[in-house]
A protein has these predicted regions:
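Post-HExxH zinc-binding segment in Zn-dependent metallohydrolases
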Residues: 46-115
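Auxiliary, metal-adjacent structural segments of Zn-dependent hydrolase domains
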Residues: 1-14, 25
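Short glycine/proline-rich turn/loop motifs
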Residues: 16-23, 82-89, 126-128
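Active-site recognition of the HExxH zinc-binding catalytic motif
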Residues: 29-49, 102
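Short pre-active-site segment immediately N-terminal to the catalytic Zn-binding motif
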Residues: 14-36
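Generic structural hydrophobic/aromatic packing signal, biased to beta-strands
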Residues: 4-9, 37, 57, 84, ...
Length: 181
């Protein structure tokens, strides 16, 4: 149905989630992350009705009309594009332009949530009222390091690692402008 996002409830089960992580090669797969990702697809379907959005989308993310099933089959059989860190927030984002959008959207929301939570709880210094994404990215770089150390100290995997470079920054900025934040 239109506007319905379906997430398999089994993903909340740790054993199932680990099997999914291994099967999909997504080290940081979580229910919350999957929901963010799928919400990106939903909002893309709405935003893609606007010609101006589509035009800019193609310039930044690529041609969304590339054969989707073939792109995913290629990704799962051969892996991500070798240079994925130079242009994408995750290996999976390199599989298809709409997956790149959904992964970027999801990562954008994760950064906003983590930074706003850390600032609100005063875990890191900064202005919780400043919603400028460039400012929040600068906070994220400090917060990410702290989260890596805390997680490793507790015996957990670190947080997702991705490069904030001109390509990913441009994609984050496009997501933010599309949201109208």
């Amino acid at each position: 149905r239109e506007g319905v996002i379906t997430i398999n409830a089994l993903e909340a089960d740790p054993e199932f989630r680990i099997r999914q992580q291994l099967a999909t090669k997504e080290k940081h797969r979580s229910v919350t992350g999957h929901f963010r990702h799928e919400s990106g697809h939903y909002f893309w379907s709405i935003l893609a009705m606007e010609p101006a959005f589509n035009q800019e989308f193609k310039l930044i993310f690529g041609e969304e009309t590339l054969p989707y099933a073939e792109s995913l089959e290629q990704y799962y059989s051969s892996g991500p594009q070798p240079n994925w860190r130079e242009a994408y927030v995750s290996p999976y984002a390199s599989s298809h332009p709409t997956e790149d959008w959904a992964e970027t959207w999801s990562t954008y929301l994760m950064i906003r949530d983590a930074v706003e939570s850390a600032l609100s709880c005063r875990l890191i210094e900064g202005d919780p009222e400043n919603t400028d994404f460039s400012y929040q990215l600068s906070i994220w770089s400090r917060l990410k390091f702290a989260l890596q150390q805390i997680n490793k100290g507790l015996g957990f995997d670190g947080v997702e690692e991705f490069e904030v470079n001109p390509s990913t920054r441009q994609k984050f900025n496009f997501v933010e402008s599309a949201i109208g934040y």
